[in-house]
Curated annotation (Swiss-Prot):
Heterodimer of a large subunit and a small subunit. It comes from Picrophilus torridus (strain ATCC 700027 / DSM 9790 / JCM 10055 / NBRC 100828 / KAW 2/3). NCBIfam families: polC, PRK04023.1. GO terms for molecular function: DNA binding; DNA-directed DNA polymerase activity; single-stranded DNA 3'-5' DNA exonuclease activity. Coiled coil: none annotated. Belongs to the archaeal DNA polymerase II family. Its EC number is 2.7.7.7, 3.1.11.1. The lineage of its organism: Archaea, Methanobacteriati, Thermoplasmatota, Thermoplasmata, Thermoplasmatales. The keyword ATP-binding does not apply. The keyword DNA-binding applies. It catalyses: DNA(n) + a 2'-deoxyribonucleoside 5'-triphosphate = DNA(n+1) + diphosphate; Exonucleolytic cleavage in the 3'- to 5'-direction to yield nucleoside 5'-phosphates. GO terms for biological process: DNA catabolic process; DNA-templated DNA replication. This is DNA polymerase II large subunit.
Length: 1080
């Protein structure tokens, strides 16, 4: 267990991080980069991150002190007022900085939302001449989350009061413009919460602050245009997000703070949602079934028999929204679910990443020979996969208590599990803590000690009807006991399948080897090897009846099934720009469509291009390069742009010579068409050459990234991650078979190790041949990467965290402590993010490379957290439970449908442990044999054609007892195929034309028939009829094979008629747009 060694671990991280910084500082100081300083500052805590992000010096100390006694929300409001008071001489700056610093605190100082989510803060005037505050939001505000979005408006309100600025008074016409925009935005992007027009009116009429936004969408409003105080006709996405998903959706949370601070104008939020009780709303349990994509199967309908059975607990690789299933289930589902795959779920949240747990129940299947069996191993599943008639039960899905707590979902009734049953054991029965009773012992124990029936012998009685129970009782009365089995008539096979009882079918008879609990539950017993009826008592329902017949308490075995479908498949792969790029070197059109620097050089091109200008420190020459082309000395930034003529061939040869590389040995070397940074700053070409030499590509910020799905792990076995005991101990762990993982250690895929090995060689080559320093990594194999540091960074954030590689898995995802994921503001519901080698980030990242467009700062390491603080990470990780065994009171609470927060203290969540001054020494309730045991690559990623994908998806629906195959077919057509066909069909007649040589686009073909930019005559359509008809055959096939609703069949037939008549498909003619025009 981790205890005092955590201090040593943190000190080791500090030491090795500072070593990398020293190397990077020495390299950067040579003047061979666009900046002479390392551009990723270390922030030791949230206070420093906020200071670095917002560039307000001197507030870190106060943030740090007040955070000890205030909640994050209270702290943000207090510091915002403080900042405003310091800057009150400039009211606009005071407002701007106050709102941004408040939002930065709310988002732990690692999101880009405070910088880019707020485009501007202004003071404007109402029609009566009074002043008001306007906040202009943009798209990146989404990453802040609804509560932080709403509180940013509240912060502006509080600050404008401090500065004596009046309230916003909207006109009726402006309010109607907002309503039109919200409806249009929801149609384009889909809001998490779509408010009613009255709710929008209510908030806007009473909001003292104008919630504005920049025009983020191409689409414009059709009415309420050219308004004086709304400066764009385009739809304002940022405004829609803050208004709908912020203030209105999070109204209850906002009220908590407005009431405390006596902001009475906001009391109107109490009326949000009050009039919705009579409205027809979609059944929440079916939300996960929306927008089904072709090729991604549905595994179970809401609470339908045969689906995943809810089981409470946390494996060592679940929690933080991740759930575990038996690896055999992955195989039985035709490998569609792999380790790390996302599934959309009915409860407790919206989605979960899937991990393996072989200590929970696996699936049951009916074979073509009529046998009903439990599939107990992947090998067995592989053997029978072509002999499966029906999948009758998917087994259990393990969901942690902490996920119910996080989603504030009342606890659903737990099945009667072994861990619950053990609480009934006394000292006499302690032997059964280590082994299961057989069928006879189970019944006798229950009778003698008045205990519920042992789990597994309780069956799914709630899944059959009273009529079916009576048929089963009659069949048992005529059953025959033979040696160690019972023979029943095959007429009751469907009833036994529903009950989850195994049997073999032989000569129209069913042979049961496990039968004694069944006959006892139905009012029979064995006397002299004969089945004898001993009870005939009846109740109103099946479960009550079997309790009465048996005289034994039989609890529900599967009271809750969890509906699910495949979401995103797991992901692991190096980050590539599109197309792949080796360096941020602009080529315009000189490199051709492949952006080849080598081809541009061979053509002898002299490029005339505007770039960021630099001045030689020695001779004063102006150049875009970091080295002077005349004297070879370093240059410095002049903070200006200028047109330069660049001899690409000479630039390439000079760069290759400086890094001792023969260009002839490099197969491809790709640049970019143009630079997106503010001043078109060019990256040293030497770096692109070395990346190409080592087969790696670049991200927009100059770093080499590897993307992976996020998967939690709290404990690992050294032999499952390619470690030896000796290496394990060198990393600071004990020599135990199972170790609790340190908070910033990560286990990466083998493929990631292979990629990072090449990156390490690139870095060493760079250090030696470009900077003239010694190598650092010196890795000869993937195993040499163990112990090296990385930066973990999530999309939509601007703060990285140091991580350490400790091993490899065969899984397409990154196993790491829940705290590590939460430090990046991620959970494990299918999220993915990236890592880069620490020294790569320090040497090669530059803010000057980042795009100047909105969102350009996202996914960039603007600050780096060295040691994570559990108090400053995403709070979801604090809800992870840590018990080895859930207490009896937990199961009693599920019987009462209790709120999860009511039992939080007994469940020992991370939050409870931290209050006690520790967060290590935790446990888990279910073991997993091997974290790589299970399907490792989702079938969705290996199936090629759409025809095969839809065939596999619907083929699985056909054999799943928990799925309605006809409904799945209808949903696939309605949510995927038909919108695609309709959209492309409409776009065909309004499309642009494109030059294949320079990519210029035209609304109409130029009269000359040639491109006006490059003169090429090869101008083509951007939408071909093939994109319209590509799903037609699959649509027809599905319509003919499945029973679809009449309205859908009519809709499809009408669409087919339109398309076939337009393109004359029946006669085999390929009608072009020219032909259509001529026919007119």
């Amino acid at each position: 267990m981790i205890d005092h060694s955590l201090f040593d671990y943190n000190e080791r991280l500090r030491k090795e991080t500072y070593e990398c910084y020293e190397i990077a500082k020495k390299a950067r100081a040579m003047g061979l980069d666009v900046s002479d300083e390392v551009e990723i500052p270390i922030a030791n805590d949230m206070a420093e991150r906020v200071e670095e992000l917002i560039h307000i010096s001197g507030i870190a100390g106060e943030i740090r002190e007040l955070s000890k006694s205030m909640s994050r929300e209270e702290l943000s409001l207090h510091i915002s007022k403080k900042v405003a008071s310091l800057l009150k001489d400039n009211r606009v700056e005071a407002l701007d900085k106050a709102v941004r610093v408040g939002l930065a605190i709310l988002t732990e100082g690692i999101l880009v939302a405070p910088l880019e989510g707020i485009k501007d803060v202004k003071i404007n005037k109402n029609d009566d001449g009074t002043e008001y505050v306007s906040i202009v939001y943009s798209g990146p505000i989404r990453s802040a989350g609804g509560t932080a979005q709403a509180l940013s408006v509240l912060i502006a309100d509080i600050v404008r009061r401090e500065l004596n600025i009046g309230s916003f008074s909207p006109t009726d016409d402006e309010i109607e413009r907002y309503i039109e925009e919200v409806e249009a935005y929801n149609r384009l992007k889909h809001l998490q919460y779509m408010p009613t027009p009255d709710e929008i009116r209510l908030v806007l009429k009473n909001s003292p602050v104008m919630i504005d936004g920049e025009g983020s969408e191409e689409e414009e409003v059709s009415g309420h245009r050219d308004m004086k105080r709304i400066t764009t006709n385009r739809i304002r996405g940022g405004m829609c997000l803050v208004l709908c998903e912020g203030l209105i959706q999070k109204a209850k949370k906002v009220l908590k703070y407005t009431n405390v601070m006596h902001l009475n104008e906001w009391n109107i939020l109490e009326n949000i949602g009050k009039n919705k009780s009579d409205e027809k709303t979609e059944n929440k349990s079916e939300k996960y079934l929306k927008d089904i994509i072709a090729g991604r199967p549905v595994f179970g309908y809401p609470n339908r028999p045969g689906g995943f059975r809810l089981r409470y607990g946390r494996s060592r690789v679940s929690g933080l929204a991740a759930a575990s299933i038996n690896p055999v289930t992955m195989k039985i589902l035709n490998d569609f679910i792999a380790i790390g795959s996302q599934i959309k779920v009915e409860l407790p949240g919206k989605a979960a990443a899937i991990t393996p747990c072989d200590s929970i129940d696996g699936p049951m299947v009916l074979t073509r020979s009529g046998d009903h069996i439990k599939v107990k191993s992947i090998e067995q599943a592989e053997k029978i996969k072509n002999d499966i008639e029906r999948i009758t039960d998917l087994g259990e899905i393990l969901i942690a208590y902490g996920d119910f707590l996080e989603n504030n979902r009342n606890l659903d009734l737990s099945p009667f599990t072994r861990e619950w049953w053990e609480y009934y054991l006394n000292d006499e029965l302690s032997i059964y803590k280590s082994r299961d009773p057989d069928q006879f012992d189970a019944v006798n124990i229950s009778r003698k000690y008045k205990m519920p029936m042992f789990p597994g012998y309780d069956y799914f009685w709630h899944d059959i009807t009273m009529e079916e129970l009576n048929l089963l009782i009659n069949a048992i009365a005529n059953g025959i006991i033979n040696d160690d089995s019972m023979m029943l008539d095959a007429s009751v096979s469907e009833i036994l399948i529903k009950l989850g009882i195994e049997f073999k079918k032989h000569n129209n008879k069913l042979i049961l080897h496990e039968y004694y609990p069944l006959i006892v539950s139905c009012g029979f017993d064995l006397i002299n090897e004969k089945i004898v009826k001993v009870s005939d008592e009846r109740k109103n329902d099946v479960l009550g009846t079997v309790n009465a017949l048996s005289g034994i308490e039989i609890k529900p075995r599967a009271p809750v099934r969890v509906g699910a479908r495949l979401g995103r498949p797991e992901k692991a792969g190096d980050r590539k720009m599109k197309p792949k790029v080796h360096g941020l070197f602009p080529l315009m059109n000189y490199g051709g469509s492949t952006r080849s620097i080598i081809n541009a050089a061979r053509s002898g091109s002299i490029m005339d291009i505007e770039l960021g200008a630099r001045i030689c420190r020695a001779c004063g020459t102006e150049t875009p390069f970091v080295r002077c082309p005349k004297c070879g000395m370093p240059t410095e930034d002049s903070d200006s742009e200028k047109k330069f003529k660049i001899d690409i061939s000479k630039a390439l040869d000079d760069a290759a010579l400086r890094v001792s590389t023969d260009i002839g040995t490099i197969k491809e070397l790709k640049g970019v068409k143009k630079l997106m940074s503010r001043r078109s700053v060019i990256e040293p070409l030497e770096k692109a050459i070395l990346r190409a030499k080592h087969g790696i590509s670049i991200n927009k910020d100059g770093t080499c990234r590897y993307d992976m799905s996020d998967i939690p792990i709290t404990h690992f076995k050294y032999n499952e991650i390619s470690l030896t005991r000796q290496r394990l101990m060198e990393l600071g762990y004990s020599d135990s078979d199972i170790n609790e993982i340190y908070p910033q250690d990560i286990i990466i895929p083998r493929d990631a190790a292979s990629y990072l090995l090449n990156v390490s060689k690139f870095i060493d080559d760079l250090l030696v041949n470009y900077y003239g320093l010694g190598p650092y990594y010196m890795c000869n194999s993937e195993d040499d990467l163990i112990g090296h540091l990385v930066i973990g960074l999530a999309p939509h954030t601007s703060g990285g965290i140091v991580g350490r590689i400790i091993g490899f898995s065969d899984v397409n995802g990154c196993y790491a402590h829940p705290f590590f994921h939460a430090a990046k503001r991620r959970n494990c519901d299918g999220d993915e993010d990236s890592i880069m080698l620490l020294l790569d980030g320090l040497l090669n990242f530059s803010k000057k490379y980042l795009p100047s467009t909105t969102g350009g700062l996202m996914d960039a390491p603007l600050v780096l957290t060295l040691i994570l603080d559990p108090e400053e990470i995403d709070k979801e990780a604090l809800n992870v439970d840590t018990l080895q065994r859930y207490p009896l009171d937990f199961y009693i609470a599920t019987e009462k449908n209790a709120p999860p927060a009511s039992i939080e203290n007994m469940m020992k969540t991370m939050k409870v442990l931290i209050k006690d001054g520790r967060y290590t020494g935790i446990s888990y309730s279910f073991d997993t044999g091997d974290i790589s045991y299970g399907t490792r690559l989702s079938a969705y990623k290996t199936i090629g054609s759409m025809e095969e994908k839809i065939e596999k998806q619907l083929g699985l629906a056909r054999i799943l007892r928990s799925v309605d195959e006809n409904d799945v077919a209808a949903r696939v057509l309605s949510s995927h195929f038909l919108p695609d066909i309709y959209g492309n069909f409409r776009s065909f007649f309004t499309q642009e034309f494109r030059c294949t040589k320079c990519n210029a686009k035209y609304r109409r073909v130029p009269l000359s028939g040639r491109c006006l930019r490059c003169g090429s005559s090869n101008i083509i359509l951007t939408i071909h009829h093939g994109s319209i008809v590509k799903y037609l055959n699959e649509t027809k096939k599905v319509m003919n094979e499945y029973k679809l609703p009449d309205y859908l069949v009519f809709r499809i037939n009408r669409l087919l008629e339109q398309i076939e008549s337009t393109f004359d498909i029946e006669n085999g003619n390929d009608t072009t747009l020219d032909a259509l025009i001529e026919n007119e």
